[in-house]
């Protein structure tokens, strides 16, 4: 399951204790808990995510690369997060827009897939494209599928 992390300003130790309790309960039932990296949350900065995952046994990351293309975390290097990724959200983004048409953004899917392959990533991927007025959603989904198939 994917859970949001606490908002910025939440005491770090409080969030660690909360996640430890949640992960321990889920782990007993065979459920993987992942935090999603999101702007304006503790799980936005790659260094903070690393410390959270290192301090909460069995905690994974539901990774959205768009956070590092558009938003408060632009320019931060998420490479160190690869080993924690248990789920991947995919959409194309630009520095000005969290979601753009597939192929018009700056998410480097080739590099992302290459890095995940090196780490032998064999987990979930979700295409997370929200329908937009004037854009055929099914065409955008097909383009993303074709892009991913060409890279895998």
Can you say where each PLM-predicted feature lies in the sequence?
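Short secondary-structure boundary/capping elements
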Residues: 14-17, 41-44, 107-108
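A cross-domain feature marking catalytic cores of carbohydrate-active enzymes
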Residues: 3-5, 35-39, 63-67, 90-92, ...
